[in-house]
């Protein structure tokens, strides 16, 4: 176990149940810092970095804010193929379809060597329920810019973003957020 105080990261070698022969670390820090330090600790660059599984989708412009996608992007910046994986549900019960999507995406990356970074969004459920896997460009949506001043659970006044989403992609665009609606 060691700490890199300048960046506020710590890393501890861990054993993963069922994967005892795999070198693994638990790293604190931002997702992109964890990916970069993890690659360094491996001693040599990995063939693939998988980030996730995130609870909740990372669709369209959400990818610009996503730590899950950011970690995958960090790997791709250094020339390592990367996949970000998200479960559409915020409280997932079954990650099987995410695993299936990851497996299919890994096959796709093997078949098309030019693919460096892909983002997988899968619904919650069993792989047998999967209706297919589709490669699409990112959609475009935005959130309200208004904030409301309200008390939090401790009675402190806090600003909260208004809920809602505005889809900017056209209805017939073949983009990611249209396939999971």
Residue ranges and their predicted role:
Residues 97-181:
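Electrostatically charged, flexible surface regions
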Residues 38-43, 70-81:
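Alpha-helix C-terminal capping segments
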Residues 1-39, 45:
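A cross-family phosphate/adenosyl-ligand binding-site feature
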Residues 46, 82-84, 111-117:
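Short, structured loop/turn "capping" segments at alpha-beta junctions
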Residues 57-66:
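Glycine/threonine-rich flexible loop motifs
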Residues 76-97:
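Glycine-rich phosphate/pyrophosphate-binding loops
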Residues 28, 51-54, 85-86, 120-123:
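Short beta-strand segments
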